[in-house]
């Protein structure tokens, strides 16, 4: 499940995320028994989704299409590239089960996330007693060609620490480790 950063499991038929546009379901070709095994061999394996879909919207033979549509405006969202925290093996990301990235933690806290917004460790679903954020992992680092500050991570970590305390059923100790706290917006220093 890419949207939940691989923390949740996805069924063969899924909606990418709750506010997806268009508000439509898709079939994961790798999980669908017909798409992954039956179609190539010409066998009618499973296809239970066709029977269950009252609207008759499932067409396993549909091919990709390229459409030209008239629109009133275009939103350009160039995106960003997430730093691969496993490159810095001394933090344990990818080796220690309880180490997650901020984006993964964001999905853990989300009501539409894999644990329904409950603050739990992904590997054992138990509530943590202590949480630490390590700032500037990969940024402000010439070695990884990211010698700049992202400009958002400090406020992001503060927000996550506050929300973690709100979502926890028991007191949780939160700590943010940083080189220097950068809060670039008006009145952000108050946090």
What positions do the PLM features span?
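Residues forming the flavin
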Residues: 1-191
